[in-house]
Amino acid sequence: MSKLGVVLFVFLLLLPLAAPQPVGDQPADQPADRNAEARARFLHPFQYYTLYRYLTRFLHRYPIYYIRY
């Protein structure tokens, strides 16, 4: 192996493996998790429109669901 190959091998493969892995429950990660939960509950206005479109297509395709008992 050439010197450049050894240097690339050390810096690109061995150093990332030896670096300490980040801990998942650090305080910096918690606000991002809360924001992800809030974004999961929020529907964009266009999503309401697509939901309405799918429901109207479904009800036109299967009119038996219009019947109320």
UniProtKB/Swiss-Prot annotation:
GO cellular component: extracellular region; host cell postsynaptic membrane
Comment field (misc): The mature peptide does not contain cysteine residues.
Residues that make up the propeptide removed upon maturation: 21-69
Compartment list: Secreted
Name of the protein this chain belongs to: Conopeptide Y-Pl1
Similarity comment: family membership: Belongs to the conotoxin M superfamily. Conopeptide Y family.
Source organism of the structure: Conus planorbis
Keywords annotated in UniProt: Ion channel impairing toxin, Ionotropic glutamate receptor inhibitor, Neurotoxin, Postsynaptic neurotoxin, Potassium channel impairing toxin, Secreted, Signal, Toxin, Voltage-gated potassium channel impairing toxin, Voltage-gated sodium channel impairing toxin
Signal peptide: 1-20
Keyword Lyase: no
